[in-house]
């Protein structure tokens, strides 16, 4: 996130092909100027009015935090003639600043079943961010709760969906705990690129 193209090109030359960005404008500019075999993941809070800009090329949207957003991604994807891969974001941290469904809100949305009519999105898993704390036990507990919720959701609503397999959790400071709890996608930036410039 927010790292210059040169830093991404260096990682690209080392073999990295999946990159994440949290700002639509930033990601679109990078998509346009960097190699086209890069797989772009959108990992920030996505506003409905910005979806149309990333739908043509985004590989995975990590932060779907409402049915309204999911429906809008579907609408824009239909216009672009695409199916967009999405992760549902769960609020697992003890911080108000983080976005996401509560476990109950997510259960309600999935049980309601409206999402099944959205033919241009594919729900591929869940995403969550742990509390930004030095308390390793708390981080482990939060990741384990999301991992166990993932298993519940998979069994209830996606048992036959091979594509429902991603659990995006863990960043530079807590990815060890995330992997131990079952993460399949870690979002590591500063450990690779150094601290970013805001």
Region roles according to the model:
Residues 2-173, 179-181, 193-195:
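Conserved alpha/beta-domain cores
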Residues 184-185:
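Divalent-metal-activated hydrolytic enzyme cores
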Residues 188, 193-198:
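Short C-terminal tail/terminal secondary-structure segment
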């Amino acid at each position: 996130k927010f790292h210059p193209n040169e830093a991404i090109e260096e990682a690209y030359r080392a073999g990295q092909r999946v990159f994440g960005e949290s700002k639509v404008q930033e990601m679109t500019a990078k998509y346009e100027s960097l190699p086209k075999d890069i797989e772009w993941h959108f990992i920030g809070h996505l506003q409905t009015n910005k979806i149309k800009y990333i739908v043509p090329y985004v590989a995975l949207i990590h932060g779907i935090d409402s049915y309204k957003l999911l429906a809008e991604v579907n609408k824009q994807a239909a216009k672009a003639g695409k199916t967009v891969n999405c992760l549902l974001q769960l609020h697992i941290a003890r911080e108000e600043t983080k976005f996401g469904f509560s476990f109950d809100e997510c259960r309600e949305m999935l049980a309601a079943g409206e999402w099944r009519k959205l033919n241009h999105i594919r729900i591929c898993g869940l995403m969550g961010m742990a509390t930004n704390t030095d308390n390793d036990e708390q981080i482990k507990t939060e990741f384990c709760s999301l991992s166990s919720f993932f298993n519940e959701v998979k069994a209830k609503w996606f048992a036959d969906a091979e594509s429902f397999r991603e659990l995006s959790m863990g960043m530079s400071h807590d990815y060890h705990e995330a992997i131990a709890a079952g993460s399949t996608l870690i979002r590591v930036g500063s450990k690779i690129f150094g601290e970013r410039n805001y």
